[in-house]
Amino acid sequence: AVLTDAVYEWNAHAPLALKGGIQPSELQEVRTLPSTADSGAEEVQALKGSALTGLQKAVVRYTDQMTLKVRVEDGVFALLKQEGLSDREVVELTTGVAGYNCVSRVLVALDVGENNAREMKSVDELVAAL
């Protein structure tokens, strides 16, 4: 949602992540970290220095590349395997990311809920609403 500016998707699904056990600090990191799609040293270093777990960092890199470049570098794919994901889990992650990318493109293109001109809710706002 963040990479595709899908305000509706963020505002609807970020609270579900919090309810599912994602910590507010982790959600904030995902919202504010620069994209690592191009594997730039600065961006990757920012991710490495974040409070996210190793698995979360690998998922962020994979998601960034899938969302913005479509093709995923072998090294980024290997990070998921290093973090212990099975082939099945990688396929499930891939289809989940692809599904959200499809939905976000429809939501933004059609301005569903007339959200394009709005800001994404802050993590603090989301937590307060729970």
Model-derived segments and their meaning:
Residues 1-130:
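Hydrophobic alpha-helical segments
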